[in-house]
Design a protein with these regions (language model features):
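Ubiquitin-like/PB1-type beta-grasp interaction modules and other compact soluble beta-rich domains
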Residues: 1-94
């Protein structure tokens, strides 16, 4: 299956691209996608965004699937399906 991954904020600058299409196995989850991205982009990605061993995004990053923040779904265990739109972004907060 294929999902479209868009990058916003600093991650877009770091990776040097706006979006890409990723090929995943049927039944893949957000965690599987992040592991693939970690393998593809290596140390820079792991250091900034996601550490596979920790199984969590680093502080300040979020994943949105089809308009919903993954925290409102099933977190990293959220299943993906063909045609999903995934956004990896820095989170901004204020006070």
């Amino acid at each position: 299956m294929k999902v479209k991954v868009s990058y916003l904020g600093y991650i877009r600058v770091m990776l040097g691209k706006r979006e890409e299409e990723m090929e995943l196995k049927e039944g893949a989850t957000i965690g599987d996608l992040l592991n693939m991205l970690s393998d593809k982009y290596g140390e820079a990605f792991r250091k900034e965004v996601y550490e596979p061993g920790l199984q969590d995004l680093k502080y300040g990053y979020g994943v949105i699937v089809n308009g919903l923040l993954m925290a409102r779904l099933q977190g990293l265990k959220t299943p993906l399906k063909d045609g999903d739109q995934v956004i990896l972004t820095t989170l901004i907060s204020g006070g």
